[in-house]
Amino acid sequence: MKRIKQAGFTIIEMLIVVTILAMLAGILVPVLEDSQKSARDARRSADLKTVQVALEAYKRENGVYPSTGGSWQGDAPSYGGFGYDASGYIPDLVPTFIQALPKDPDGSIPVADRGYFYRSNGADYKFGAHKTPESFEAGNP
Protein backbone atom coordinates (compact mmCIF):
# COMPACT_ATOMS: atom_id res chain seq x y z
CA MET A 1 0.00 0.00 0.00
CA LYS A 2 1.25 3.41 -0.96
CA ARG A 3 1.13 6.26 1.55
CA ILE A 4 0.14 9.64 0.21
CA LYS A 5 2.04 12.46 1.82
CA GLN A 6 -0.23 15.27 2.89
CA ALA A 7 1.12 18.80 2.93
CA GLY A 8 0.28 21.02 5.86
CA PHE A 9 1.21 22.00 9.37
CA THR A 10 0.78 19.93 12.49
CA ILE A 11 -1.15 21.28 15.42
CA ILE A 12 2.10 21.61 17.39
CA GLU A 13 3.67 23.75 14.67
CA MET A 14 0.58 25.98 14.62
CA LEU A 15 0.66 26.38 18.41
CA ILE A 16 4.33 27.34 18.29
CA VAL A 17 3.66 30.00 15.63
CA VAL A 18 0.68 31.42 17.56
CA THR A 19 2.75 31.53 20.76
CA ILE A 20 5.59 33.38 19.04
CA LEU A 21 3.16 35.89 17.51
CA ALA A 22 1.52 36.48 20.91
CA MET A 23 4.91 37.14 22.50
CA LEU A 24 5.85 39.60 19.75
CA ALA A 25 2.53 41.41 20.15
CA GLY A 26 3.10 41.62 23.89
CA ILE A 27 6.43 43.31 23.26
CA LEU A 28 5.30 45.66 20.49
CA VAL A 29 2.05 47.01 21.99
CA PRO A 30 3.72 48.89 24.91
CA VAL A 31 6.40 50.27 22.57
CA LEU A 32 3.76 51.60 20.19
CA GLU A 33 1.75 53.11 23.06
CA ASP A 34 4.86 54.92 24.33
CA SER A 35 5.58 56.34 20.89
CA GLN A 36 1.98 57.59 20.63
CA LYS A 37 2.31 59.33 24.00
CA SER A 38 5.56 60.96 22.89
CA ALA A 39 3.95 62.11 19.66
CA ARG A 40 1.04 63.71 21.57
CA ASP A 41 3.52 65.41 23.91
CA ALA A 42 5.43 66.80 20.91
CA ARG A 43 2.15 68.12 19.49
CA ARG A 44 1.31 69.80 22.82
CA SER A 45 4.72 71.44 22.90
CA ALA A 46 4.24 72.78 19.38
CA ASP A 47 0.74 74.00 20.29
CA LEU A 48 2.10 75.88 23.30
CA LYS A 49 4.69 77.61 21.12
CA THR A 50 2.10 78.50 18.45
CA VAL A 51 -0.21 80.08 21.03
CA GLN A 52 2.71 81.93 22.61
CA VAL A 53 3.51 83.52 19.24
CA ALA A 54 -0.16 84.49 18.77
CA LEU A 55 -0.35 85.98 22.28
CA GLU A 56 2.75 88.09 21.67
CA ALA A 57 1.29 89.32 18.35
CA TYR A 58 -1.94 90.24 20.17
CA LYS A 59 0.04 92.19 22.78
CA ARG A 60 2.06 94.04 20.12
CA GLU A 61 -1.17 95.21 18.51
CA ASN A 62 -3.26 95.88 21.63
CA GLY A 63 -0.70 96.67 24.33
CA VAL A 64 -2.07 93.96 26.65
CA TYR A 65 -2.66 90.23 26.59
CA PRO A 66 -6.23 88.91 26.16
CA SER A 67 -7.72 89.15 29.65
CA THR A 68 -9.77 86.56 31.48
CA GLY A 69 -10.10 88.83 34.50
CA GLY A 70 -7.53 86.69 36.28
CA SER A 71 -9.69 83.55 36.20
CA TRP A 72 -8.62 80.25 34.66
CA GLN A 73 -10.24 79.25 31.39
CA GLY A 74 -9.64 76.18 29.30
CA ASP A 75 -11.06 73.61 26.97
CA ALA A 76 -11.35 70.96 29.71
CA PRO A 77 -14.53 70.97 31.83
CA SER A 78 -12.45 71.49 35.00
CA TYR A 79 -11.40 74.87 33.54
CA GLY A 80 -14.90 75.92 32.59
CA GLY A 81 -15.14 74.06 29.28
CA PHE A 82 -14.76 77.37 27.43
CA GLY A 83 -14.76 76.84 23.72
CA TYR A 84 -14.01 73.20 23.38
CA ASP A 85 -14.63 73.94 19.74
CA ALA A 86 -11.23 75.67 20.08
CA SER A 87 -12.46 79.22 19.85
CA GLY A 88 -13.22 80.56 23.28
CA TYR A 89 -10.81 79.84 26.09
CA ILE A 90 -8.49 82.72 25.11
CA PRO A 91 -10.71 85.72 24.37
CA ASP A 92 -10.30 87.68 21.12
CA LEU A 93 -7.38 85.63 19.78
CA VAL A 94 -9.34 83.74 17.11
CA PRO A 95 -9.37 84.32 14.10
CA THR A 96 -7.18 87.44 13.88
CA PHE A 97 -4.06 86.09 15.57
CA ILE A 98 -4.54 82.34 15.29
CA GLN A 99 -6.91 80.34 13.10
CA ALA A 100 -8.14 78.15 15.96
CA LEU A 101 -7.04 77.50 19.51
CA PRO A 102 -5.50 74.07 19.94
CA LYS A 103 -7.37 71.09 21.33
CA ASP A 104 -5.59 68.41 23.28
CA PRO A 105 -4.37 65.75 20.82
CA ASP A 106 -5.65 62.95 23.04
CA GLY A 107 -8.78 61.67 21.33
CA SER A 108 -10.54 60.98 24.64
CA ILE A 109 -11.13 64.69 25.26
CA PRO A 110 -13.17 66.24 26.76
CA VAL A 111 -11.90 64.89 30.03
CA ALA A 112 -12.31 66.87 33.24
CA ASP A 113 -8.62 67.09 33.98
CA ARG A 114 -6.74 67.16 30.68
CA GLY A 115 -6.47 69.94 28.16
CA TYR A 116 -5.18 73.48 27.67
CA PHE A 117 -5.74 76.30 30.13
CA TYR A 118 -5.16 80.06 30.15
CA ARG A 119 -5.29 82.91 32.67
CA SER A 120 -4.44 86.57 32.24
CA ASN A 121 -5.00 89.91 33.92
CA GLY A 122 -3.86 91.69 30.74
CA ALA A 123 -0.35 92.47 32.00
CA ASP A 124 0.89 88.88 31.92
CA TYR A 125 -0.49 85.40 31.28
CA LYS A 126 -0.16 81.73 32.02
CA PHE A 127 -0.90 79.16 29.35
CA GLY A 128 -0.28 75.46 29.66
CA ALA A 129 -1.34 71.90 29.06
CA HIS A 130 -2.81 70.18 32.11
CA LYS A 131 -1.82 66.59 33.09
CA THR A 132 1.05 66.40 30.66
CA PRO A 133 3.52 65.21 29.54
CA GLU A 134 2.00 61.78 29.09
CA SER A 135 5.30 60.14 28.22
CA PHE A 136 6.56 60.50 31.81
CA GLU A 137 5.43 58.00 34.37
CA ALA A 138 3.42 59.52 37.22
CA GLY A 139 5.75 60.97 39.82
CA ASN A 140 8.85 60.60 37.65
CA PRO A 141 9.16 63.62 35.35
Which role fits each region the language model picked out?
Residues 2-32:
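N-terminal single-pass transmembrane signal-anchor helix
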Residues 56-129:
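Extracellular/periplasmic head regions of type IV pilus-like filament subunits
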Residues 14, 35-38, 58:
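Amphipathic alpha-helical segments that mediate coupling or scaffolding at interfaces
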Residues 133-141:
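Short, low-complexity, Pro/Ser/Thr/Gly-rich segments in the mature regions of secreted, periplasmic
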Residues 31-50:
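Aliphatic-rich helix starts adjacent to a transmembrane/signal segment
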